[in-house]
Amino acid sequence: MRALLVAGVVALALVVLAPASAAKKGGCPAPWNAGWQKLANKVDAPVYCPTWMPNPLDAKIGGDYQDIYSIGKDHSFLVSFLELGDLGSGDVHVNFRGYPGHTAIPRCPAPVGHGKVPCFSEPVGRMSANGIHATVYQVNQGADQWHIALAWHYDRSLYIVSEHVIAPYRFTTQIKRNLGRLLTSLVLVKPAG
């Protein structure tokens, strides 16, 4: 019982506490801006930089928490941030995706058998903040498997942010709360030039 109580307090603290590097609303935080600007320039399309991340993550591309940085030939991108917990304490994992010039949900290899399935499926609601109207998806594939994802359109492009449902954020309500904060925190970074 005591372990469950301690785990609950730790999970609540992780939801409430914002990382020290969270920035004021208005622009991408200075320590993170160069990486997001470089990404926007490489994909030649706007990208969304968060000004808040779930504790303990930051969103510094090239930083300690970056897990994946991938740009496809079609300029689609995946930027992932991950903290692996010690001794079974769980992971904190957030993905940012963009599909410049494409608005359709992409297709992924089927988890069992042959064929393709939507990479994001089973919409369960909507979230709106910061001028963004996102659809909430609960069944996702690839690097977003076991995540809850928000997907929206901007400038004829599809954008997605997702977070893994796992301890310390093991409840969908915690993840949706984090995704709501992320959505509120997003600032648009346009390509230079």
Residue ranges, per PLM feature:
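Bacterial N-terminal signal peptides that target proteins for export
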Residues: 1-6
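Bacterial N-terminal signal peptides
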Residues: 7-15
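Polybasic, lysine/arginine-rich low-complexity segments
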Residues: 24-25, 177
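Short, solvent-exposed recognition patches
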Residues: 25-157
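Surface-exposed amphipathic alpha-helical segments
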Residues: 155-193
